[in-house]
A protein has these predicted regions:
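Thiamine diphosphate
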Residues: 2-15, 48-223
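Internal gly/pro-rich beta-alpha loop/helix module
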Residues: 8-26, 32, 36-47
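A structural motif
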Residues: 27-28, 52
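Short active-site oxyanion
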Residues: 28-30, 88-89
Length: 223
């Protein structure tokens, strides 16, 4: 409960540390749903799973999806490909999936196509999918409502390094910086740290423009 920004409850109630400390628990499965429908799926999956598991979900309301269907058993460590396009991949965890989809729609209108992945799991990661993205995209942007240190983006970076792909693709990590977060309205705080649709759109666009500049800039020849 209260995974992520929870400023309405006071600055000591933000749930920003859980990804980092839960990743260190051996053999645990750690997950976060994109909405209330997937939350039911994850609760069902945790009940059926033979092993330790943890799920984070945010304070507040759902996004309004239909929850009348029977819950679905999810494959542990399997992400969901929400959108497949272009040379950019936005890999979002939990509450950041829907803002990432909105950002991708806006980017598409400007000619920047982006794949969007609902990571679902931070442990275990969907290594086959993430490594495939690293080999086929030129930019991966991870988005999480948690501290960057030891978080979801760090887990992805570790995976790329372990497979020798850290220099194959540009990785940009979006999340909460290394500072104490004040009390405040969650929507305003998320916007302040660039973790809403506008912030994700701006960061992806800036990153693409930077890569384009590097691609067109003449390379120096050292004799």
């Amino acid at each position: 409960d209260r995974g992520g920004i929870a400023g309405g409850d006071g600055q000591t109630h933000h749930g920003l540390l859980d990804i980092a400390y839960l990743r260190g628990v051996p053999n645990i499965s750690v997950m976060a749903p994109k909405n209330e429908g997937e939350m039911r799926d994850m609760l069902f999956t945790m009940i059926e799973h033979n092993g330790p598991a943890a799920m984070r979900y945010p304070r507040g309301n759902g996004v309004g999806v239909d929850i009348s269907r029977e819950p679905e058993l999810l494959e542990i460590g399997k992400a969901e490909l929400m959108r497949d396009a272009g040379e950019v991949a936005i890999v979002a965890y939990g509450s950041m999936v829907h803002p990432s989809l909105a950002a991708a729609d806006r980017l598409s209108k400007e000619g920047i196509e982006a794949t969007v992945v609902n990571a679902r799991f931070v442990k275990p990661l969907d290594a086959p999918l993430l490594l495939a993205l690293a080999r086929t995209k030129r930019l991966i942007v991870t988005v999480e409502e948690a501290y960057l240190a030891g978080g979801f983006g760090s887990a992805v970076l570790e995976l790329l390094e372990e497979n020798g792909l850290q220099d194959r693709v540009r990785l940009v990590r979006m999340g909460i910086p290394d500072r104490l977060i004040t009390h405040g309205d969650p929507k305003l705080l998320l916007a302040k740290y660039g973790l809403d649709a506008d912030g994700i759109y701006n960061r992806v666009r800036e990153s693409v423009e930077l890569l384009d500049e590097r691609r067109t800039k003449p390379q120096r020849v050292v004799s």
